[in-house]
A protein has these predicted regions:
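Bacterial Sec-dependent N-terminal signal peptides
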Residues: 1-23
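Flexible propeptides and autoinhibitory/regulatory segments associated with cysteine proteases
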Residues: 20-216
Length: 216
């Protein structure tokens, strides 16, 4: 067992040295590499213990677009997107009688949809972190949301013909999301000017209809 651990440790050290090296044009190589274009990007952020890579990756793209179009570096709130996406997924889940997926995952096209419908805010205005929480962890939140939605779906199935669900469950799902992620801001200040999420989206001058998501 000790030999195996030592072997793994040496392997990690070896590969660590390889990947830590600076990549340059080798003096004796016939290949010459030259940077002809550079696309600015915001710093890479951690999604913590959450299934929200789709929000982080898509917003990183739009942050680069803001730098290209407005020459301004703005980090957008991934959790603002996640908060509204969960609500929209919950509504669709009940409307489709539980035949759609209610999970942590998402895709690029969710971001333009949410921004067009709800606007967007800077990351500092909505972190999605509770007091004294330093990193993202959605394990408990998702279990609570999943259990709640299971109860709503069962109630819908138990209704008699002609009966329908009240809208109170929607306030319930919003309450859970607010408890874990925080209430979304209605107004905030950016560079000395007051914005709503919708007016801030307009300020960014990103036309969501200009972007198309393609997958293979």
């Amino acid at each position: 067992m000790k030999k195996q651990i030592l072997s793994i440790g040496l392997s990690l050290a070896f590969f660590g040295q390889i990947f830590a090296q600076t990549v340059t044009n080798h003096p004796e190589s016939s290949y010459k590499f030259e940077q002809i274009a550079n696309h600015d990007a915001t710093p890479v952020l951690s999604q913590g213990m959450s299934g929200t890579c789709w929000s982080f990756s898509a917003l990183s793209f739009f942050e680069s677009e803001i730098m290209r179009l407005k020459k301004e570096q703005i980090v957008l709130s991934e959790m603002y997107i996640v908060r509204h996406a969960y609500y929209e997924k919950a509504v669709k889940y009940i409307r489709m009688d539980g035949k759609t997926n209610f999970g942590e995952g998402g895709a690029f096209h969710d971001i333009p949809y949410i921004i067009k419908r709800y606007g967007i805010v800077p990351a500092g205005e909505y972190t999605g972190l509770r007091p004294n929480e330093e990193s993202i962890n959605h394990s408990e939140m998702f279990n609570v949301l999943n259990g709640f939605m299971g109860g709503v779906l069962k109630t819908a199935h138990d209704l008699r013909r002609g009966e329908s669900l009240s809208d109170s469950w929607k306030a319930g799902i919003s309450g859970i999301l607010d408890a874990y992620l925080g209430a979304v801001p209605k107004n905030f200040t950016h560079n000395g000017k007051s914005y709503t999420p919708q007016s801030f989206a307009e300020y960014l001058k990103l036309n969501m209809d200009d972007y198309v998501s393609i997958t293979s």
